[in-house]
Amino acid sequence: MLLSDRDLRAEISAGRLGIDPFDDSLVQPSSVDVRLDCMFRVFNNTRYTHIDPAQRQDELTSVVEPTKGDPFVLHPGEFVLGSTLEIFSLPGDLAGRLEGKSSLGRLGLLTHSTAGFIDPGFSGHITLELSNVANLPITLWPGMKIGQLCILKLTSPSEHPYGSSGVGSKYQGQRGPTPSRSYQNFIRST
């Protein structure tokens, strides 16, 4: 069940759904707008010959923070990681679905590639997978509305929510745009 604006406010007021900082004007009819933080993670194209999900490649990306008051310019065909300004904390019976903003999509900005699902129990900044599919650069302003988070009520609480031991919650408590930790899940067949 998708939560309405009334249900979202009730969950926030009850302290079950955490959004920090919270701005009530960001609550939409069935979602909460999310804003862009000021840090970005860009790919260092000269450090590696290719990306290998099985390998830890610590220098594959580096953090870039625009000068205060300046935008980050995302060029055509570029892919960078960003994150939400807000920290989200979901209880064991609520999950989230991150979607882009229609107005930004019409400019060629994709907010996430594949990781739009937020597990119950997650707590942290949401990493954004930002792509410019337009043929002109797009300016990304820290603090701008960058997406919307829909909250879904589970039919029952999760038995092992994100963050539980043994679940492999690699991104619990993440701060800022967090690089891939796919190597932690990689199993080679022999």
Curated annotation (Swiss-Prot):
Keywords: Hydrolase, Nucleotide metabolism, Nucleotide-binding. Coiled coil: none annotated. Residues 161-190 are annotated as: Disordered. DCTP binds at residues 101-106, 119, 127-129, 148, 162, 174. One of its GO terms (biological process) is dUTP biosynthetic process. Pathway: Pyrimidine metabolism; dUMP biosynthesis; dUMP from dCTP: step 1/1. InterPro entries: dCTP_deaminase, dUTPase-like_sf, dUTPase_trimeric. One of its GO terms (molecular function) is dCTP deaminase (dUMP-forming) activity. Its EC number is 3.5.4.30. It is an enzyme of class 3 (hydrolase). It catalyses: dCTP + 2 H2O = dUMP + NH4(+) + diphosphate. The keyword Hydrolase applies. The active site is at residue 129. Homotrimer. Belongs to the dCTP deaminase family. PANTHER family: DCTP DEAMINASE (PTHR42680:SF3). This is dCTP deaminase, dUMP-forming. The lineage of its organism: Bacteria, Bacillati, Actinomycetota, Actinomycetes, Mycobacteriales.
